[in-house]
Amino acid sequence: MTTRPPITLSIAGTDPSGGAGIHADLKTFTARKTMGTTVITALVAQNTHGVSRVYPIDVDFVADQFESVLGDLPVDATKSGMLGSRDLVELVVDRAAEGRLGFYTVDPVMIATSGHRLLETDAVDAVRTHLLPVADLITPNLPEAALLISDDEPEAQTTEAMRDQARRLLERGPGAVLLKGGHGSDDEVIDILATADGQVREFTHPRVTTMNTHGTGCTLSAAITAEVAVLGHEHTEIGSDILGEAVGNALDYLARALTSAADWQLSLNPEGAHGPVDHQVDIVSGRPA
């Protein structure tokens, strides 16, 4: 009898400081008990103070990476983060359309917290019209959700506005939308999960007061991807209830990771630094609660 772990794939850029991108995704995949694989789209010079330079990877080489992974390993679930260009968006769309990515989560990374643009302007329309329809789940934050709807859409300011935007994003074709409320200012963070079958549910967590929020979006989408891969080994289909369970588990993990790292001071220049979350909170003993 042969066995294997759930296999997950991250399509994203690098982060040499280890807090976001491919590096955060691999840590999260391991923490959530899957075997992580990668397709790297860009080499990014960044740290806890922001992005300083992006070096895009040639599209042909990205395609070669895809073939190296997908031609050899049965991927159960995939997430994409930084894609960068229209050509890369279209390449990922092609791979998703081939049915080789498993359950596919799109984290629509567009602009870094530091303000550095991570998606070319002409690629935004390709994300809206081509990438979203092949996604099983998209995980935009409030600014990203507004931009995915239209160039002049305002950010949602209320829970009801979030629900409305999540429903409107569903009209662009993804199987589900997780609209993240972390960019709000309330004491509680509310995230909205809307699925194509008409279900809408809220997830609520106390806001963790910390500067160490670097890579939270990457970590959450990777955790959801891993949870779906694990649950997919137990269920024949990822319906709304199973997806809701995966999202809930991932949000709980992120809350623990944020809380554990809330008081970390990693940077040699701490003023204005945004450190990472504690990806290993569940697997390394001795972490402060």
Segments and roles (model prediction):
Residues 5, 53, 235-238, 244-289:
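Charged C-terminal helix
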Residues 14, 80-81, 116, 180, ...:
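Glycine- and other small-residue-rich loops at beta-strand/loop junctions that grip anionic moieties
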Residues 121-200, 228-244:
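Conserved phosphate/ATP/ADP-binding segment of small-molecule kinases
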Residues 2-10, 22, 27-118, 274-288:
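Conserved N-terminal subdomain of the carbohydrate kinase-like
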Residues 16-19, 207-224:
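Short glycine/threonine-rich catalytic loop with a Thr-x-Gly-x-Asp
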Residues 1-5, 10, 21, 187-203:
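Acidic-glycine-rich active-site phosphate/pyrophosphate-binding loop
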